[in-house]
């Protein structure tokens, strides 16, 4: 058994390579180190930009990645207790300080506005008094038959009468005959109130009263006896038809003196007045 052991030792010694036979590639292989040790050994390389001077890292300001922290509620209370400022003082400090000159100018502007308002109120009061007077006169004299004479004596009463008749839609042959001349004259008026009232009156007359007027004008008187009322109605109706024909005849002249809105309203009225032009 000892002989066998000796033989195995000899064969093992023969197969064993000497230390000099280690390949050179292993010797020339670079000695590797850990990443952390290499990172520590590297030096800080300064960054150079084109057109700017070299700066060392120490010269640059240090920035931190930490976000700005909001102050706590307790800290804000402490700060308020240290510097107590009342709300009234803050409000007074924020308001601009007014100089005496600016206060004088504000007072003068307020006074001018107040005087303008007073003047307008006085004008409204004068108009209201005139309207109330016209209404009283109309109520006292509306049942009389001589309305033409009343309107001819008091020209300011005609607009009030026309507005009342428009609101009540109570136009008749007598009121049409009394107001039609005033309506024709004020269709082209610069006063918007008069112009609109006259247009509304003419539209109301042509809508509800035109056929009645044509009928009164075409009635024939009796051969035996005299009907005074029928003759008066026929005469008034004939005069109204004559005035209607004047409006149709002077259409182009009227159009040159009114605006577009009034032209649209007058077109509808003239369309209804075609019946008058065909009537003999």
From Swiss-Prot:
Residues 1-104 are annotated as: Disordered. Its main location: cytoplasm. Residues 93-104 have a biased composition (Low complexity). This is Meiotic spindle formation protein 2. It comes from the Eukaryota. GO terms for biological process: cell division; embryo development ending in birth or egg hatching; meiotic spindle disassembly; meiotic spindle organization; microtubule depolymerization. Forms a heterodimeric complex in conjunction with mei-1 which severs microtubules in vitro in an ATP-dependent manner. This activity may promote rapid reorganization of cellular microtubule arrays. May act to target mei-1 within the cell. Required specifically for meiotic spindle formation in the female germline. The keyword Cell division applies. The keyword Cell cycle applies. It is found in: Cytoplasm, Cytoskeleton, Spindle pole. It comes from Caenorhabditis elegans. Keywords: Cell cycle, Cell division, Cytoplasm, Cytoskeleton, Meiosis, Microtubule. One of its GO terms (cellular component) is condensed nuclear chromosome. The gene is mei-2. Residues 72-92 have a biased composition (Basic and acidic residues). Interacts with mei-1.
